[in-house]
Amino acid sequence: MGDWSFLGRLLENAQEHSTVIGKVWLTVLFIFRILVLGAAAEEVWGDEQSDFTCNTQQPGCENVCYDRAFPISHIRFWALQIIFVSTPTLIYLGHVLHIVRMEEKKKEREEELLRRDNPQHGRGREPMRTGSPRDPPLRDDRGKVRIAGALLRTYVFNIIFKTLFEVGFIAGQYFLYGFQLQPLYRCDRWPCPNTVDCFISRPTEKTIFVIFMLAVACASLVLNMLEIYHLGWKKLKQGVTNHFNPDASEVRHKPLDPLSEAANSGPPSVSIGLPPYYTHPACPTVQGKATGFPGAPLLPADFTVVTLNDAQGRGHPVKHCNGHHLTTEQNWASLGAEPQTPASKPSSAASSPHGRKGLTDSSGSSLEESALVVTPEGEQALATTVEMHSPPLVLLDPERSSKSSSGRARPGDLAI
């Protein structure tokens, strides 16, 4: 047999542009077919015709019997099988080299156009792009040719034809020789005078090689089927992804803007949801009446009027405003009727129709709290009037103040 090194180099170049399963298939082809065929099988079948003997002296009978027993030698049959199975891969390799060469020529033309341009017109000019902006790049991140588009179709046809050739050669080997060689072969072909017995050399060893090459062919067939399934499943997932997200491929192949990358590199903003805050509008009528009540005395700076809503009140906010308005009017009326003397405060607090209770703290300021007020709408409101006075003056002489505060007459007192 001839030298397989040239075919091996070509297939090695094709291995760089194949899938993982395709690389395994090429490894099986190299080791278990080409090497075994060149190293061992040729030695076994080297003496095939010379050792094929028949029990006849008729000239030409032995040759015609050998031709019927072996229409084609096993060695040549397997060599043809390797060549036919490798041909689709070589066609795919030619397509890859053609694409790479076209890409190189396109880059050379772009560089030549840039060199021909004048410096005024050529500065800052980008290389011309002849392809569509949506076309995927020729090479992937690792610098290998991307299997996509027309190249992917060529690769699929490559696998399909390899599978068909494998099936055809397995079937041909079965119909030509079977899977086992018998040591005795009977031949009755002309010009043999009668049925003659012919004997095959090394039948057992040849049978082992036949079974081995058949097993390798079946393994290659299984690898082809797995590769078709792998590519089909990958293409199906890609189609489903593009169907549900048609802009994914555009975003994947679209170059990113450096400014957008810098803007997006910061920490993501986090929005915290807060519970809704409801505010009840202030009643304008109450505020106006409180400040401009007719006949109301001027309030000191330390006087504060606070109106509290009852937590159990229900109804429309307008009703609350009406209740607050009536309560404020009653407070101002009672405040105007009371004399502005400290002595009358306890009596006025005790005789208040609303049951006010006077509270005095340690600092001397008085606190007055009113009871619940029932509005005409049947609602309850709590009005609290707070009077805050400045603390009493501190006496400079405690003894003098105690003497003057005593009510009994002393001998040293002057009579006026």
Curated annotation (Swiss-Prot):
Disulfide bonds: 54-198, 61-192, 65-187
Main location: membrane
Region (Disordered): 110-141, 336-416
TM helices/strands, residue ranges: 20-40, 72-92, 159-179, 208-228
Start-end of intramembrane regions: 2-15
One annotated Gene Ontology cellular component of this protein: plasma membrane
Tissue specificity as recorded in UniProt: Detected in eye lens (at protein level). Most abundant in lens, but also present in heart and kidney.
Complex formation: A hemichannel or connexon is composed of a hexamer of connexins. A functional gap junction is formed by the apposition of two hemichannels. Forms heteromeric channels with GJA8.
Annotated protein name in UniProt: Gap junction alpha-3 protein
Gene name for this UniProt entry: Gja3
